[in-house]
A protein has these predicted regions:
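Beta-strand-centric surfaces of beta-sandwich/beta-rich domains
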Residues: 1-227
Length: 227
């Protein structure tokens, strides 16, 4: 966020008659269910697109614009208890094969590419998802007798998996936005990951969605619908 020049952005909006635009730090969080036969995922951007909308997603209002400065691609897991989903979500920055071999089912998420276009003009192309793969350190070997092996990663989502978008790109609520994830092969469903903490306790997650997290600025009333 430190690279953004607020004064320059406000000057650009004033130059097109939008001096009343309010700029605030903001995020978009977009997810889609994993489909075992699908290699292309088109993330829905707007609040008005409800086909795949879930309660935890953050979408763009049609009256606003979003200026993206950093972006991350993740696998989204849902906490399960006795095989039943709880609605509690966690993001994965890699396929945790140290926990379960079937994690390789979604490993190709990090072998794809991202394309972003606005009104059919491509502003981001061939952006490899390998940039977003982050494999953290975990404690496999016991350093003292009786200490449990911990396979719980220390993901810090303010940094981990996020990559700067330079130059920044702008999505508009009044335009046709396309955020497309392209994979070499389909990623399979049915991956259940069990994570062990250093006390030996386990937590289970079902990997069932792909996620795109964007951070940047929201320009309230910045779209062409507003004067």
């Amino acid at each position: 966020m430190a690279r953004i020049n607020y004064a320059q952005l406000m000057a650009k909006y004033k130059a097109i008659g939008k001096g009343a635009v309010r700029l605030t730090q903001s995020s978009l969080y977009l997810t889609l269910p994993i489909n075992a036969t699908q290699t292309i995922y088109n993330f829905e951007i707007l609040e008005s697109q409800t086909a795949n909308l879930t309660a935890d997603q953050i979408r763009l209002n049609i009256n606003d614009e979003f200026i993206c400065t950093t972006l991350g691609i993740y696998a989204e897991g849902e906490l399960t208890i006795a095989g039943v989903g709880t609605g509690i979500k966690r993001l994965f920055t890699y396929a945790p094969v140290e926990n379960v071999a079937t994690a390789r089912l979604f490993e190709n998420l990090y072998s794809g590419s991202l394309q972003i276009s606005v009104n059919n003009i491509v502003f981001l192309d061939k952006f490899d998802t390998r940039k977003h793969e982050f494999i953290p350190q975990t404690q496999f070997g016991s350093f003292a007798a009786g200490t449990q092996n911990a396979t719980q990663s220390n993901g810090q989502y303010s940094k981990v998996g996020m990559f700067p978008i330079e130059p920044s790109l702008t999505l508009s609520g009044s335009k046709k936005n396309q955020v497309q994830l392209q994979l070499p092969t389909a990623i399979a469903t049915g991956c259940n990951v069990q994570i062990t903490d250093n006390t030996g306790g386990t937590t289970n997650y079902a990997i069932n969605r792909v996620a795109c997290l964007m951070r940047g600025l929201n320009a309230q009333n910045g779209s062409v619908f507003q004067s």
